[in-house]
Swiss-Prot record:
It holds the Pfam family MitMem_reg. Its main location: cytoplasm. This is Eukaryotic translation initiation factor 3 subunit F. It comes from Bombyx mori. SMART domains: JAB_MPN (SM00232). The gene is eIF3-S5. PANTHER family: EUKARYOTIC TRANSLATION INITIATION FACTOR 3 SUBUNIT F, EUKARYOTIC TRANSLATION INITIATION FACTOR 3 SUBUNIT F-RELATED. Gene3D superfamilies: Cytidine Deaminase, domain 2. Component of the eukaryotic translation initiation factor 3 (eIF-3) complex.
Length: 289
C-alpha cells in the first residue's frame, strides 16, 4: 500500500453520513457504510456513499451484505464510471472491528480507504480523517495490519459551492425553528457574487497597501496575488465596461427566455388537460338487483 495517496471528499458525502447517524437505531453506537467514487493516480475522490446496517459484538461483526450488494448494483446502473473506493464510519478513532470490516472491502476494491467522521463533535468540531491499511508482520510469522493516516481534503463542484453558500445563510442561532432560505433567482445570485467579489478585492487591496507600507507580509500570499493580477486581461476601462455590459445583457436574455419557456410549458399542460377526451368505461354486465 502506497502512503502517497490523497483523499478528496465532496460535501454531499458528509451530509449523507450525518443523516445516517441521525437515523441510526437506538442501540447503535457507530454507523458504517460504503464509499463511492473514483481512484486515479493516487487521488481518491469520494462523490457518494451509502449506509450498511450492521451490528458489532465483542468477537465478531454482523453486516447485511445482501443489502449492500443491492445498493451497489443500483448505483452501478446510475453511474457506471464510479465504483467502491473504501468505507466510512462515524467516530473519532479506529476500533478493533475496523480491521475485520476493512478486510471485506479489500475484496471489493483495490487499496480501499477508510474515512472517519466524528459526529460526537469532540473538541467542538466534526473531525474528518482518512486512513489506509498497511500490512505488518514478519515472513512466515504472525501477520497484522495498521491504519495509517493520509491527507484528506474537501472538494466541491460549482453547483455544490452554490448550495453550500445557501446553506451558510441558514447558520444563525435560531436552531431548528429557524425559517428556510430560498436559493433566489439567477440575477440575485449574480449580484450577490459581484458584491462578494468586490469585498474580496477590497481586502486584497488593503493587504497590498499594508505590505507596501512595511507591514509583515506572506510571500505565498504575494505570489498568489501576483498570479491573479497577471491572469486578468489587459483591457482598457471602456472596453471592459462594454464587455461586462454585453455579458449582463446575455444573462438577462437567457433568464427571460427561460421564463418564457417555463410559462409556455405550464400553459400547454393546462390546455392539454382541458382538451383531452374524458376516458369513460361502459359496463355491459347485468346489474345486481
Amino acid at each position: 500500500m502506497a502512503l502517497n495517496i490523497s483523499v478528496k471528499v465532496h460535501p454531499v458525502v458528509l451530509f449523507q453520513i450525518v443523516d445516517a447517524y441521525e437515523r441510526r437505531n437506538a442501540d447503535s453506537h457507530r454507523v458504517i457504510g460504503t464509499l463511492w467514487g473514483t481512484s486515479d493516480k493516487g487521488v481518491v475522490e469520494v462523490t457518494n456513499c451509502f449506509c450498511v446496517p450492521h451490528k458489532e459484538h465483542a468477537d465478531q461483526v454482523e453486516a447485511e451484505l445482501n443489502y449492500a450488494m443491492d445498493v451497489y448494483e443500483l448505483n452501478r446502473r446510475v453511474n457506471s464510471s464510479e465504483s467502491i473506493v473504501g468505507w466510512w464510519a462515524t467516530g473519532n478513532e479506529v476500533t478493533n472491528h475496523s480491521s475485520v470490516i476493512h478486510e471485506y472491502y479489500s475484496r471489493e476494491c483495490r487499496e480501499p480507504v477508510h474515512v472517519t467522521l466524528d459526529t460526537s463533535l469532540a473538541g467542538g468540531r466534526m473531525g474528518l480523517r482518512a486512513y489506509v491499511c498497511v500490512p505488518l508482520g514478519v515472513p512466515n510469522g504472525k501477520q497484522g495490519c495498521m491504519f495509517t493516516p493520509v491527507d484528506v481534503t474537501l472538494t466541491c463542484y460549482e453547483p455544490e459551492i452554490v448550495g453550500l453558500q445557501v446553506c451558510q445563510k441558514t447558520v444563525s442561532g435560531g436552531g431548528r425553528g429557524s425559517s428556510g432560505v430560498a436559493a433566489g433567482s439567477d440575477l440575485a445570485q449574480v449580484m450577490s457574487a459581484a458584491s462578494s467579489l468586490e469585498s474580496l478585492l477590497e481586502q486584497a487591496l488593503q493587504y497590498a497597501d499594508g505590505a507596501a507600507a512595511g507591514a509583515p507580509a506572506d510571500a505565498e500570499a504575494g505570489r498568489a496575488l501576483l498570479q491573479l493580477a497577471h491572469s486578468a486581461p489587459d483591457l482598457a476601462k471602456d472596453t471592459f465596461s462594454d464587455a461586462f455590459a454585453s455579458s449582463v445583457k446575455d444573462l438577462l436574455m437567457v433568464v427571460t427566455l427561460a421564463q418564457l419557456i417555463k410559462t409556455q410549458l405550464q400553459l400547454n399542460e393546462k390546455l392539454t388537460l382541458l382538451t383531452s377526451p374524458v376516458n369513460t368505461t361502459i359496463y355491459k354486465g347485468r346489474p345486481n338487483v
